[in-house]
A protein has these predicted regions:
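Beta-lactam-recognizing serine transpeptidase/beta-lactamase-like catalytic domain environment
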Residues: 2-5, 83, 216-217, 221-225, ...
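Periplasmic/cell-envelope proteins involved in peptidoglycan metabolism and beta-lactam response
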Residues: 1-298, 324, 399-407, 519-521, ...
Length: 667
């Protein structure tokens, strides 16, 4: 073998000048970048330090809790609380905390059982299924007393084993008088609201506050609180004492006699303030969806959810503002006032009633087939003579009659501050033919609501001023300071004081010697008018009877309107139940309001009502014979006809309908 030669040595790479320069440049670049960052940080610290500090702190938020506002109260005119929000608590579970130590679970469950109506298995399930949760709302609207009892147990727990339970402050809406004025006050719950609660929701509603917590730069816990803005208080015109009187008498009537529905409205004619209002079923505002007071369990079991909702809507519906019927004879004073204003009649005008009037070839009878004979203007209202009213309507003609109907807000909303007010139906001027005018003159062929009739009569007896009916008396802050005072709103001057005086005196005679003697209250001068309406279908012989009265006659301070829908008697048409119920209510309301007593035997200006005329048979004229009425379009309310004076022979009364003749459409 040959010999190996000597091994070759590896050449060492030299760190050349070029590489040294590159390394130096890289180092300098890094230094420059680092210096630039330092300069930038210094700049930001001085120029935008506060802004960035706040941004960082905002990202370190510890907690954020809503602070519930308190909804404003609803009071009666004297400060009696009808609706308020009370302080309650929501029970919050913190499963993460409860599970953090084994010894926490059982003592905590035991304390919950002692103080609250809890389902232990349900709580265990929540803790197991949400082990990392720190916020589970378990119960709502817990009274403060129960919370205080639980907190006392926590305080007495020396081992500190009751953990993971805390309470969130909240408010609960309560109605101290339960069903009192339920149609007016209304309720707010589960996304539904009615009455004042609905109409003045914006004023009653406040704004939630919020509590924030975070750690500052030194890790100190900081709290920022934005206080809640509470809602305003609504002071209503309702008088709780008068409301109680009304509801007591209606309840007694329903127990003794009964009806499909009984409604009463009490208002001050001088400013149109509503003092009391009731209609339909009375329900507990604290539990408005409870149907058990109205239906048996078997009935409820058979009802679908849709049927239950329909039943609730019927119960919640306010008949006074949302339902309509033919006003009948309660409208007659409006026709008389219109003709007086136009100078077509006077208190000395006389009329002859032969028991029937031929209108465009059709015979329309008066209630008294034999006729009333010659009667004065006052006696047309005293004895509710349809023939005389048709004569007056004929003198008026269509245009003035329609103008006065609209002046008294028939066919329009009155503007009362309650939701779901209806307009009713009246004939348009171009549809007021001779027959339509004749029947409308005595209150038949068109629909109106209780609030429309009461507001119109108030204007007739207060000197002629039509005020907007209202329920708001005052708006207050949550501290009780007055924000707004609701003064009487004059809509228009409907008739003159002279006309008002004549009508008042005629209505006084109606109570003293006419069709409304059952409404008399000893010691008080009362004016008023009866009404009877026949409902559809006619063959069922179902009627709605009514009476509207005011006192004292010289200077009316209160109007009371009573409607009894289908009284539980055989002869509904000739019943005087509305007048009698008025009498019972007025007998208590007048003394309560300090209405001055005046002996009715004293001389009183009766607008020439004492003139010597052929006097009808009072017994016959105190009956009211209903006639055919109207067929409503799209109404939920039962439709009714009129009353005491239009028996017909082979004649169908014209009606104002939605499709062609109604001046307004129900909404």
């Amino acid at each position: 073998m040959g010999e190996r030669g000597p091994a070759k040595k590896k050449k060492k790479k030299k760190f050349g000048l070029f590489m040294q320069q590159n390394l130096l440049l890289s180092f300098l670049l890094i230094v420059l970048i680092f210096v630039g960052l330092i300069v930038r940080l210094i700049y930001l610290n001085y120029s935008d330090g506060d802004k960035y500090e706040k941004r960082v702190l905002s990202q370190q938020t510890y907690m954020s809790n809503a602070i519930a506002y308190k909804r404003g109260s609803i009071l009666d005119r004297n400060g009696i609380v009808l609706a308020e929000s009370i302080h309650v608590y929501n029970l919050i579970l913190d499963p993460l905390k409860i599970r953090s130590k084994e010894e926490y679970l059982e003592p905590t469950l035991k304390a919950l059982r002692e103080c609250f109506d809890v389902n232990e298995e349900e709580v265990r399930k929540i803790i197991e299924e949400k082990p990392k949760s720190q916020y589970v709302v378990y119960q709502k609207s817990i009274e403060a007393e129960k919370v205080e009892k639980f907190q006392a147990l926590v305080k007495a727990d020396k081992d500190k084993t009751i953990q993971g339970v805390w309470f969130e402050a909240d408010y609960k809406r309560v109605y101290p008088y339960k069903s009192l004025a339920c149609d007016v006050v209304g309720f707010t719950s589960a996304g539904t609201s009615t009455g004042i609660e609905a109409y003045y929701n914006e004023q009653l509603t406040g704004e939630d506050g919020r509590e924030y917590g975070y750690f500052d730069s030194e890790l100190n816990l900081e709290r920022v609180v934005k206080e809640a803005a509470n809602g305003n208080t609504v002071v209503s015109t309702i008088d709780a004492n008068i409301q109680q009187i009304v509801e007591k008498q209606v309840a007694k009537f329903n127990k003794d006699i009964g009806s499909k529905n009984t409604a009463v409205l009490v208002m001050n004619p001088k400013n149109a303030e509503i003092l009391a209002m009731t209609s339909g079923e009375q329900y507990d505002l604290n539990n408005p969806q409870d149907l058990t007071p109205f239906y048996k369990k078997k009935q409820l079991d058979r009802m679908s959810e849709e049927e239950k909702l329909e039943a609730l809507n019927r119960i919640w519906r306010n008949f006074v503002v949302s339902d309509t019927f033919e006003p009948g004879s309660t409208f007659k004073p409006v026709t008389v006032a219109a003709a007086l204003e136009e100078g077509l009649i006077s208190p000395k005008t006389t009329f002859y009633c032969g028991g029937v009037k031929n209108v465009s070839g059709s015979h329309i009878h008066c209630a008294k087939r034999a006729g009333h004979g010659t009667i004065t203007l006052a006696q047309t209202l005293m004895f509710s003579c349809n023939v005389a009213l048709m004569d007056i309507g004929e003198k008026l003609k269509a245009h003035p009659f329609y103008r006065y109907q609209t002046n008294f807000m028939f066919g329009s909303r009155t503007g009362i501050d309650l939701p779901a007010e209806t307009t009713g139906y009246i004939f348009k001027e171009e549809n007021l033919g001779s027959t339509e005018l004749a029947t409308s003159s005595f209150g038949q062929g068109f629909n109106s609501s209780m609030i429309q009739i009461a507001s119109a009569v108030s204007a007739l007896v207060n000197g002629g001023s039509y005020y907007q009916p209202h329920l708001l008396k005052e708006l207050q802050s949550d501290k009780g300071a007055t924000i707004e005072t609701n003064t009487a709103k004059l809509i228009k001057k409907a008739v003159s004081p002279e006309t008002s005086a004549i009508v008042k005196n005629a209505l006084f005679e109606t109570v003293e010697n006419g069709t409304a003697t059952a409404a008399k209250v000893e010691g008080y001068q009362i004016g008023g008018k009866t009404g009877t309406a026949q409902k559809l279908p006619r063959k069922d012989k179902k009627y709605l009877v009514s009476f509207i009265g005011f006192a004292p006659v010289e200077d009316p301070e209160v109007v009371i309107y009573v409607v009894v829908d289908e009284p539980d008697v055989a002869d509904q048409a000739h019943s005087t139940f509305a007048s009698e119920l008025f009498q019972k209510i007025a007998s208590e309301v007048y003394p309560f309001l300090n209405i001055p007593r005046t002996a009715v035997e004293e001389e009183h200006d009766k607008g020439n009502a004492k003139e010597e005329v052929s006097k009808p048979d009072e017994k016959d004229d105190q009956k009211e014979t209903p006639a055919d009425g109207i067929t409503p379009a799209g109404q939920v309310a039962p439709s009714v006809g009129d009353e005491e004076g239009s028996e017909q022979e082979d004649f169908d009364l014209p009606v104002a309908d939605q499709s062609s003749s109604a001046s307004n459409i129900y909404e």
